[in-house]
């Protein structure tokens, strides 16, 4: 019997997602032991989560620097009009583009890119010029990288005190 996404995200489902985010290579027996289900029930739950789109595959994290991709940068693109669609299609063909996000505000797209050198980054920026105005920020370090989704605990939010109004 198929479950909907709400039912799949019960206590067992949330524990399962936490375990998979920590180590997606665990066996069904070990996953089941950790979340309190049999290996068969765990496997069925995984299959259903894949079918409804909660899970989208199991990937390895690869160290970009081990591949010689020493430079990481964000490029904000302002293009507008017809150039937006052309640029969106073009960046999908670029191996250097790791992520591309459509934005509100003054910029149209935000690209996360990696290259082997500053020379390669410069060549990439020049290739983007016909599509609009690229503004580049080099990444010096990443204090928070690939944060897991909080699925079993509450999300932590920062609260600010409201400023006192002058009368």
Question: Which residue ranges define each predicted feature?
Answer:
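A compositional/biophysical signature of low hydrophobicity enriched in polar/charged and small residues
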Residues: 1-167
């Amino acid at each position: 019997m198929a479950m909907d996404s709400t039912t799949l995200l019960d206590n067992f489902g949330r524990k399962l997602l936490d375990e998979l985010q920590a180590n997606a290579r665990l066996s069904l027996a070990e996953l089941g032991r950790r979340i309190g289900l049999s290996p068969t029930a765990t496997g069925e739950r995984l299959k259903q989560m894949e079918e409804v789109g909660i899970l989208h595959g199991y990937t390895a994290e690869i160290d970009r620097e081990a591949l010689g991709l020493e430079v990481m940068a964000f490029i904000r693109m302002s293009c507008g009009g017809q150039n937006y669609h052309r640029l969106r299609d073009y960046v999908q063909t670029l191996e250097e583009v790791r992520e591309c996000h459509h934005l509100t505000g003054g910029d149209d797209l935000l690209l996360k890119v990696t290259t082997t050198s500053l020379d390669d980054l410069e060549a990439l920026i020049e290739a983007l010029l016909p599509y609009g105005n690229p503004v580049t920020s080099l990444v010096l370090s990443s204090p928070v990288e690939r944060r897991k989704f909080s699925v079993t605990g509450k999300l932590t939010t920062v609260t600010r005190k409201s400023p006192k109004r002058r009368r």
